[in-house]
Amino acid sequence: MNFFPWLTIIVILPIFAGSIILFLPHRGNRVIRWYTICICILELLLTTYAFCYHFQLDDPLIQLVEDFKWIDFFDFHWRLGIDGLSIGPILLTGFITTLATLAAWPVTRDSRLFHFLMLAMYSGQIGLFASRDLLLFFIMWELELIPVYLLLSMWGGKKRLYSATKFILYTAGGSVFLLMGVLGVGLYGSTEPTLNFATLVNQSYPVALEIILYIGFFIAFAVKSPIIPLHTWLPDTHGEAHYSTCMLLAGILLKMGAYGLIRINMELLSHAHSIFSPWLVIVGTIQIIYAASTSLGQRNLKKRIAYSSVSHMGFILIGIGSINDTGLNGAILQIVSHGFIGAALFFLAGTSYDRIRLVYLDEMGGIAIPMPKIFTMFSSFSMASLALPGMSGFVAEFIVFFGIITSQKYLLISKLGITFVMAIGIILTPIYSLSMLRQMFYGYKLFNAPNSYVFDSGPRELFVSIAIFIPVIGIGMYPDFVLSLSVDKVEVLLSNFVYR
């Protein structure tokens, strides 16, 4: 067994290294940028090395386990560990955060604080995916709130204070339910409270209590995911945030909610999950149609992409609700796939805004010829979003489809109805995606727009776009690269629903 604290180093390195930024020269923007990027690259290399040489793919148990006693009073430990469910989101976090710091290169105002907040988010995100203690999970969950609030309120658009306040109210409200659920699970059934995931997996609860706990956790995760009707903070937040912040929100933050649903609601509260899974499938199906229809009516480019993210989260809900190894693996693949695609679309939307200073689609048009590189990359990621075969979005959605069809939990007529409605949502996706492309890149409006600086993508922006596009194509061509990480863990997780 390896006793080197790889995960502790990976979790604390960004925030501790980021704190040094606050002592760097105030006017050394270039130094701050390169320092932050180097820290992110070092973190990503450490993570990749630890996983490649110390993680066994065929072992579904928790690996790289670290357990340090923190507070004796209620058995609170610094417990970290990874399995096939968490390794994908951790690698996604490292990859997207590294590219987001490169995307934030134009930020010059208060750049020390900006880059420190990005690194603080990095630690919180990896800490959440690696935590094996419920209270530590909650602490890492809360660690996201202040950095995102400050990034929104200080580097956002004209309505940044409104969107930041709305974000903090929604997420803090959801955190209350998460804390109540953590305390309820930790304090039940024992004279000595325990918050250890390994112990809680085998804990049984009265049906009524388990349902109450499940609902509490679900509300908390539904805000972050987001799940309708708790999604209204997302379009406002994306509409005002800097595009590097949007990359972190769409690529990682939303996936934390989906991860929580699998890790806590599904793994710890399996009996309640089997009761509520049909409702998850129904809500996910409605979400696909509703968000796709709403996206089509959005004038604001970033809000249209935000609603497309809400729509794609519906597939994750359906996969989680299928209680089927195929469907759940599809949901995990969709978490990774949409992390790449959503981050790329917001990055390209932000770079386009930097040039034309327009955000409303009906004011755009005609930028395909002067900006062919941005047009090509935006079109490519739009195709990935609408699930074009050969790209990651198609594989993830197809596996979720197959999972719900082959699920033994639902009647044939129910499965046919669900797949029919899902198919309608998939038809709506190219409608809003292609109309967005048409309004942005075709026509002649832009040539008459004042104060427009129409020049194509530079090397930095092209590098970020291509770096995200490579895994989108790679997963589309060879999805087993991601599925091999989770398949054994999913099989063990679903065994709870067979024997319980």
From Swiss-Prot:
Its main location: plastid. InterPro entries: NADH_Q_OxRdtase_chain4 (IPR022997), NADH_Q_OxRdtase_chainM/4 (IPR010227), NADH_UbQ_OxRdtase (IPR003918), ND/Mrp_TM (IPR001750). Its EC number is 7.1.1.-. It catalyses: a plastoquinone + NADH + (n+1) H(+)(in) = a plastoquinol + NAD(+) + n H(+)(out); a plastoquinone + NADPH + (n+1) H(+)(in) = a plastoquinol + NADP(+) + n H(+)(out). It is a multi-pass membrane protein. It is an enzyme of class 7 (translocase). Keywords: Chloroplast, Membrane, NAD, NADP, Plastid, Plastoquinone, Quinone, Thylakoid, Translocase, Transmembrane, Transmembrane helix. It holds the Pfam family Proton_antipo_M. GO terms for molecular function: NADH dehydrogenase (ubiquinone) activity; ubiquinone binding. The keyword Calcium does not apply. The keyword Cell cycle does not apply. It comes from the Eukaryota. One of its GO terms (biological process) is ATP synthesis coupled electron transport. The chain crosses the membrane at residues 3-23, 37-57, 87-107, 113-130, 134-154, 167-187, 208-228, 242-262, 272-292, 305-325, 330-350, 364-384, 386-406, 411-431, 462-482. Belongs to the complex I subunit 4 family. This is NAD(P)H-quinone oxidoreductase chain 4, chloroplastic. It comes from Daucus carota. The gene is ndhD.
